[in-house]
Regions:
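Basic, glycine/lysine-rich polyanion-binding surfaces/domains
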Residues: 1-168
């Protein structure tokens, strides 16, 4: 991230040893006090933020919890741990890939990964790496490829295998 701060007078710290990110259902989030059904809406729970996922509320809410308070927060929220694979499967079904994307690095623009639809691109502010290309693609309405979810009805698909729709 330090590469992207340009000349801003900010410090970026790695706090991954102090905090953990967890997810709860949208229904559980809306059952908490002072919540709203708005993507990105944030509340504080014991000083830690809980927010409705800004990419899609179907993903539920995200919690950023201090590791020292994790067990107590889970208990107070009446949560039970689940297999994170379920979360990633739901994410992929919604067209929001989060794992297994390493091969796409430097080969695809954010706009081709649906970042605009996922509230990840703002065409009104700031500059960022790839902004010129992204703006040109948007302006000319020329998205030549797009990352989309699909359901395999029969069989299995191998990496780099061609996929056809109605033999085309």
């Amino acid at each position: 991230l330090n590469l992207y701060k340009l000349r801003s007078k900010i410090e970026i710290l790695n706090l991954s040893n102090e905090f953990v990110v967890a997810s709860i259902s949208k229904e559980k989030f809306l059952g908490l006090k002072n919540t709203k059904n708005e993507e990105g809406y944030t509340i504080k729970f014991r000083q830690d933020p809980i927010f409705l996922d800004p990419r899609s509320s179907k993903l539920g809410a995200r919690l950023i919890i201090n590791l020292e308070k994790l067990y107590l927060s889970i208990k107070k929220l009446n949560l039970k741990p689940e297999d994170p694979i379920k979360y990633y499967e739901l994410s992929h079904k919604l067209g929001i890939p989060q794992i297994g994307c390493e091969k796409l690095k430097d080969k695809i623009f954010g706009i081709e990964c649906n970042f605009e639809e996922l509230n990840g691109i703002d065409f009104k502010k700031g500059c960022y790496v790839g902004q010129e290309n992204t703006a040109r693609i948007k302006l000319k309405n020329k998205i030549s490829k797009r990352l989309l979810p699909f359901k395999v009805i029969d069989g299995k698909i191998k990496i780099n295998e061609d996929i056809y729709f109605e033999n085309e």
